[in-house]
Regions:
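Glycine/threonine-rich beta-strand-loop-alpha-helix active-site module
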Residues: 1-71
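Short, well-ordered alpha-helices that flank and scaffold nucleotide-derived cofactor binding pockets
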Residues: 2, 144-145, 163, 182
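Carboxylate- and glycine-rich phosphate/diphosphate-binding segment that chelates Mg2+/Mn2+
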Residues: 42-149
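A short glycine/serine-rich beta->alpha loop
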Residues: 75-76, 147, 160-167
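A short beta-alpha structural unit
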Residues: 109, 133-137, 160, 177-182
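Feature representing long, continuous alpha-helical segments
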Residues: 140-141, 155, 159, 175
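Gly/Pro-rich interdomain helix-loop hinge
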Residues: 161-187
Length: 187
C-alpha cells in the first residue's frame, strides 16, 4: 500500500530515505501461519536490483481486516509449515525480563511446538492449524514485546540471506539462529 499512496520510489521508504505519509488500506487472507503480518505494523520487500531485502514498520500499514481460515492452510507442504513455525518462534525475542509478558510468550512457544508436531502427522488437523495461525498473529502484534526492547538481529541477518537466495524465511532463520545465540549468549 505504500507504493500507491506515496510519491516517488517505494524503495525510498524501505531504505529509510523518507517516511511514508500514507498507505493504501490493505487486508490479508492467510495461507500460511508464519510472520503474523495480519496483525503487524511491519512489512518486508526485496529490491531485485541488488537483491536487498528490507523491512519497514509504521501503523499506517496495519491490515484493516484479515481472513484467518485454518482450512486454507491444509494443502501447505509440511516443510513450509515448519518454516512458518520457526518464523513464529523467532518473534519471541525480548532482551529484558517481565514475568507476565514472558509467560505469555512461553505459552505461545509451547503451543507452536506442540501443534507443529501434530501437523507433521495430521496436516489437516483444524485445531492445530488454528492454534498455529493464532500464535502467529499474537507473536507479531507486540503482545509479547509490549514495553520491552527486542533483538531483531536474526531477522536482519536472514533478510540478507533470503534477499540474495531463494530461501524460505523460516529456513533462513533456523540456519542463522544457533550461531547468533552462541554469539550473544554471555551478553
Amino acid at each position: 500500500g505504500y507504493g500507491v499512496a506515496n510519491e516517488g520510489d517505494v524503495w525510498d521508504i524501505y531504505s529509510r530515505k523518507k517516511e511514508a505519509e500514507a498507505c493504501l488500506p490493505v487486508g490479508a487472507v492467510l495461507t500460511i501461519a508464519a510472520a503474523g503480518s495480519e496483525m503487524s505494523w511491519s512489512s518486508v520487500i526485496t529490491n531485485e536490483d541488488g537483491w536487498i531485502k528490507r523491512g519497514y514498520s509504521n501503523d499506517l500499514g496495519r491490515c484493516r481486516f484479515a481472513v484467518m481460515n485454518p482450512e486454507l492452510t491444509y494443502t501447505l507442504p509440511i516443510y513450509q509449515t515448519k518454516c512458518g513455525a520457526v518464523d513464529i518462534l523467532m518473534y519471541f525475542n525480548t532482551e529484558t525480563d517481565f514475568e507476565v509478558t514472558d509467560r505469555i510468550a512461553e505459552g505461545l512457544m509451547v503451543s507452536v511446538i506442540h501443534n507443529t508436531r501434530i501437523l507433521m502427522k495430521e496436516p489437516e488437523n483444524y485445531n492445530a492449524r488454528a492454534s498455529l495461525m493464532w500464535a502467529s498473529s499474537l507473536s507479531h502484534n507486540n503482545l509479547t514485546g509490549c514495553g520491552l526492547s527486542s533483538d531483531w538481529a536474526t531477522h536482519q541477518l536472514e533478510h540478507e540471506v533470503s534477499g540474495m537466495f531463494d530461501v524460505a524465511h523460516g529456513a533462513g532463520l533456523a540456519a542463522v539462529w544457533g550461531s547468533w545465540a552462541r554469539y550473544v549468549y554471555e551478553e
